[in-house]
Amino acid sequence: MKTIFRVDSRIVHGQTVNYWCRKYNVSKIIVANDELAKDDFRKLFFKIAISDEIDLEFLTIKSSINKEYDKTINCMVIFEKIDDVIKYVKEDGKINKIILSNIGYGEGKVKMSEGVFLNEKDKEKVSILQKDYGVDIVYKMMPD
């Protein structure tokens, strides 16, 4: 089976469940974010958005690297921001391809694709992921 890696600033929401999880038959979502892993209040809201058919787990970035993924299911690892992905690969996490989707507009950001806006620092980080870590970057709001 496979593991899909995504950056989504909204983390878990209707598009995640209704489109991404259905398209790739995902039965487990891991949210890799140090702050959220410790925030029980915020986690509760995300758990409400997920159907019981999908297992949702919140881990620190380091814990998500060391996590033994069930090879019999499709899993999605979601990062809230590109900084989390940089931390993941610097800690020896392996990512061949990551999908950037739902990174909102803000001051100094430019549109890279539908729903994905990056500032200069974000672009530099994407370049580091590509050049230094060999990560294939895909800009995609919705699955095909």
Regions inferred by a protein language model and the residue ranges of each:
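Long, hydrophobic N-terminal alpha-helical segment
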Residues: 1-50
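Short coil/turn connectors at secondary-structure junctions
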Residues: 1-2, 25-27, 72-74, 93-95, ...
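General beta-strand structural signal in soluble alpha/beta enzymes
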Residues: 5-7, 31, 57-59, 98-100, ...
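Short secondary-structure boundary/capping elements
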Residues: 9-13, 56, 121
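Extended, low-hydrophobicity, polar/charged segments
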Residues: 24, 34-37, 52-61, 75, ...
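Short, aromatic/basic amphipathic alpha-helical patches
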Residues: 43-48, 88, 128-129
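Ordered, amphipathic secondary-structure segments that act as subunit-interaction surfaces
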Residues: 59-102
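Glycine-rich, aromatic-bearing surface loops/beta-hairpins
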Residues: 82-83, 91-144
